[in-house]
Amino acid sequence: MPWRILVERPFLGDFFNTGRGEIEKFSDKTIDELVRACFAMGRVKTGALIVMEDEINLGEYIRTGIDVDAILTSQLLINIFEKNTPLHDGAVIVRGNRVVSATCYLPLSDSLALSKDLGTRHRAAVGVSEVSDSLTIIVSEETGAVSTAYKGQIEHDIDADHLRTQLKLLQNRHREPGKFELIKRRFKNGKEASKNLHK
């Protein structure tokens, strides 16, 4: 398989970046563009790997790729993953409504529960889902099937409605404050309590 840019890497997330107080949520338009792109690529068997960042910061993996920082559109994704183009290997990472990086390295899952027939792209999708709360979309270059990986589990050969539902669930998922935000709140509350004692 010529697509071999993904290698096994440890997750080195920064403590203060692991949970962010402000999460960049993606819009309904971004969902439409993602679904359109994935199934357009599937029809012509263009392989793709798209990681939707959620609360856990994926900066460690973003830095392994090439900066894109562009509004996500279906045509942009199709252009990135077009075969024999400089950006088609590796993963795209999406933050909010923007493609932040392409050709990113991801950790490969070594889970014994996965089929031995699973390819590198699918193992990378599961791998990043094991170390983060991201949702990863995979388009198979062999079959054109669209699959997703989330929390270490993979769903194979889903249809457009199911992908849209998964993206909506991620978009609307209840988010609790991250660690850094909780620390800031406790520090602020402590300062306010101290002020009240001295009034």
Report the location of each language-model feature.
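Divalent-cation
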Residues: M1-K199
